[in-house]
Amino acid sequence: MVRIRLTRMGKRKQPFYRIVVVDSRKRRDGAYIESLGYYNPLKEGEIKIDVERAVDWILKGAQPSDTVRDIFKKFGVMKRVHEIKYGKKEEATSE
């Protein structure tokens, strides 16, 4: 199974994470398929994500980890995936 998860970078006591697409059997910091962005918790939650690639990978079946799913919700990635899969909700017309 392909997962979207965080891989740790940076020095000791100064964590920095990359958001990567990886085979679920690989190690946390092992080889990955593609990097989608980064997350720096020390700089007030500095986050950069390639939204289009993230949506593409989720539509292909990649499963985001719980933490990555929360990050994606902040950027509207999960909402966009839902709209693509199930269509936009039509606004109710009131007469």
Swiss-Prot record:
- Which SUPFAM superfamilies does the protein's record reference? Ribosomal protein S16
Which keywords does the record carry? Ribonucleoprotein, Ribosomal protein
Query: An example Gene Ontology cellular component term from the record?
Result: cytoplasm
One of the protein's GO biological processes: translation
Superkingdom of origin organism: Bacteria
Q: Which Pfam family, an example, fits this chain?
A: Ribosomal_S16
Q: Does the keyword Oxidoreductase apply?
A: no
Quote the Gene3D superfamilies the UniProt record gives: 3.30.1320.10
- Quote the protein name from its UniProt record: Small ribosomal subunit protein bS16
Q: Which organism is it from?
A: Thermotoga neapolitana (strain ATCC 49049 / DSM 4359 / NBRC 107923 / NS-E)
